[in-house]
């Protein structure tokens, strides 16, 4: 494949053109009066979105070099999304502003490496200042405010997320599902829940709702397939004597053993149900161990030298209540808190050690199931297009609230960055010199960009609004929904400090990379194949 090689100013200008295109497409969504973007899909209906990173992922340009610019700035959005889950549009607008300012200086002959160093130092200073200005999130009102701002000023969503956070705690998991109705609902599960139901519908104790509900049951946990009913007989006899129900969670139960259990259940000899173990491979074993710790039992596994036929009542777990439907099982246990705490710490350590985001997510789920519980938000909408948009907004809102709990909140609406401009200018003038100082001042000039854009999307003059905000106290900003200057904390217009910080760091990082680019190597577009010879001649006339 032949390559095109472009140097110096031409290279940077080509990147800039790509960045301009992407930034403009994303920036129209910023703020309470931001517009939507329609994305054409190869299959199905077009998607209407208001989410920066989703729009960025869709943009592909014909020109290879401009497309490289798009890919670079897209990285600022997706990295911010990975770190904080929101703030992708802010990151894009900021990166664009820093690149614009920086390229002007590079074109005038400034040393790009020193500029980048200045940009990095300025970013470090700003990150510390954001940390100092952040207020911890103490009540569910603040959480609701963060949630509703991220969901596009939807107070109902904010309340719902605050309620979910309240119930499941900081460690809990809030997951999203597509609901069946027009309204968005919140469902909170107490205890541990996993996505496996009873193996046979004959285990249902409530035939009307097709649920099996057991109070004060014993729990037999094993990671092997139960093939012979003889293995189970000793346990079944002990449980029958104790007069309590039994729930078996195993890798699988073969037909013969299953038939025996069903017959005993139907004859009323023993109140029993069997469920397949959740997960697969090593994760399955870990989840079974979690359940064992939660219920104060033992996992019957041959690795530990334990055999089914030798199992005693003491090895069985105990729960307050177990509810089993055809596709899920919920265990409510008042287990031994000390063991559960130890297990939670162990999972936390694993989370710190792992690099994979998939593993982290799975460990977080296990942590939530052990320590808090799980809240499910069922997203409701009239059409599928609206449903997808709502789901993206809700995802942002949930991520933003988690980020707020982690690092606190700062005034929203681009206010924090605009107010930090004068502080950065003072610090840079006294601590940096020459081109490093120029680099820091590039960042200072770019900081009000998100606020300007929010004001412009609301039909105001961005530059004027930004100047007026800078004159006011730190907490005072521009409320674009009402076109007024208000105390942002009182008005509930707040951003998580983590989102503002991540957006700034990723924007500065990508902008620094673009400014220090001196050469681009891209694939040469392949010439379109000419029509094969003779194909065009007399194409319409056939001799039969």
From Swiss-Prot:
Binding-site residues, ATP: 29-32, 86-90, 413, 479-481, 495
Cellular-component GO terms for this entry: cytoplasm
Pfam families: Cpn60_TCP1
Keywords: ATP-binding, Chaperone, Cytoplasm, Isomerase, Nucleotide-binding
Catalytic activity: ATP + H2O + a folded polypeptide = ADP + phosphate + an unfolded polypeptide
Chief place of localization: cytoplasm
Any one Gene Ontology BP term: protein refolding
Keyword Acetylation: no
A Gene Ontology molecular function term of the record: isomerase activity
Domain of life (superkingdom): Bacteria
E.C. code: 5.6.1.7
PROSITE patterns (UniProt xref): CHAPERONINS_CPN60
UniProt cross-references to NCBIfam families, sorted A to Z: GroEL, PRK00013.1, PRK12849.1, PRK12850.1, PRK12851.1
Function: Together with its co-chaperonin GroES, plays an essential role in assisting protein folding. The GroEL-GroES system forms a nano-cage that allows encapsulation of the non-native substrate proteins and provides a physical environment optimized to promote and accelerate protein folding.
Assembly and interaction partners: Forms a cylinder of 14 subunits composed of two heptameric rings stacked back-to-back. Interacts with the co-chaperonin GroES.
Descriptive protein name: Chaperonin GroEL 1
Gene (UniProt): groEL1
């Amino acid at each position: 494949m032949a390559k095109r090689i472009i140097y110096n100013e031409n290279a940077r200008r080509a990147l800039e053109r790509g960045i301009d295109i992407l930034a403009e497409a994303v920036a129209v969504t910023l703020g309470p009066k931001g517009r939507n973007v329609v994305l054409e899909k190869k299959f199905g209906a077009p998607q209407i979105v208001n989410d920066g990173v989703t729009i960025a992922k869709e943009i592909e340009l014909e020109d290879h070099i401009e497309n490289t610019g798009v890919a670079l700035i897209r990285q600022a959005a997706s990295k911010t999304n990975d770190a904080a889950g929101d703030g992708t549009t802010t990151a894009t607008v900021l990166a664009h502003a820093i690149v614009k300012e920086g390229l002007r200086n590079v074109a005038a002959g400034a040393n790009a490496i020193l500029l980048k160093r200045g940009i990095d130092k300025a970013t470090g200073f700003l990150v510390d200042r954001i940390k100092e200005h952040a207020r911890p999130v103490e009540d569910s009102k603040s959480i609701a405010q963060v949630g509703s701002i991220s969901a596009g000023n939807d107070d109902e969503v904010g309340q719902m997320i605050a309620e979910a956070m309240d119930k499941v705690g900081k460690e809990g998991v809030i997951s999203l599902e597509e609901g069946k109705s027009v309204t968005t609902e919140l469902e909170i599960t107490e205890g541990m829940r996993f996505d496996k139901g009873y193996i046979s519908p004959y285990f249902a104790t409530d035939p009307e709702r097709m649920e099996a509900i057991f109070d004060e049951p014993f729990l037999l946990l094993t990671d092997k397939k139960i093939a012979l009913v003889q293995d189970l007989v000793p346990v079944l006899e002990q449980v029958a004597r104790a007069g309590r129900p039994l729930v078996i969670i195993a890798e699988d139960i073969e037909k013969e053993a299953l038939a025996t259990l069903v017959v005993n259940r139907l004859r009323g000899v023993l109140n029993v149900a069997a469920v397949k173990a959740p997960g697969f491979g090593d994760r399955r074993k870990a989840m079974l161990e979690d359940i064992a710790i939660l219920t104060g039992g033992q996992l019957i596994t041959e690795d530990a030298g334990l055999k089914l036929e030798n199992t005693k009542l003491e090895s069985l777990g105990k729960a307050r209540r177990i509810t089993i439907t055809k596709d899920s099982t919920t265990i409510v246990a008042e287990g031994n808190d000390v063991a559960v705490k130890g297990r939670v710490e162990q999972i936390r350590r694993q989370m710190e050690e792992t690099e994979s985001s998939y593993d982290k997510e799975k460990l977080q789920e296990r942590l939530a199931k052990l320590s808090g519980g799980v809240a499910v938000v069922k997203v409701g909408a009239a059409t599928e297009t609206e449903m997808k948009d709502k789901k993206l907004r809700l995802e942002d809102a949930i991520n933003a609230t988690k980020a707020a709990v982690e690092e606190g909140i700062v005034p929203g609406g681009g206010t924090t960055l605009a107010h930090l401009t004068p502080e950065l200018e003072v610090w840079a003038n006294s601590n940096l010199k020459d081109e490093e100082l120029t680099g820091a001042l590039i960042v200072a000039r770019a900081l009000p960009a998100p606020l300007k854009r929010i004001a412009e999307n609301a039909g105001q003059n961005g530059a004027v609004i930004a100047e007026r905000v800078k004159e006011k106290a730190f907490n005072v900003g521009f409320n674009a929904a009402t076109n007024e200057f208000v105390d942002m904390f009182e008005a509930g217009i707040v951003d998580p400090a983590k989102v503002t910080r991540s957006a700034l760091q990723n924007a500065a990082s990508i902008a620094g990379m673009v400014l220090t680019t001196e050469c681009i190597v891209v694939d040469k577009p392949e010439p379109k194949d000419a029509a094969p010879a003779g194909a065009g001649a007399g194409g319409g006339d056939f001799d039969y």
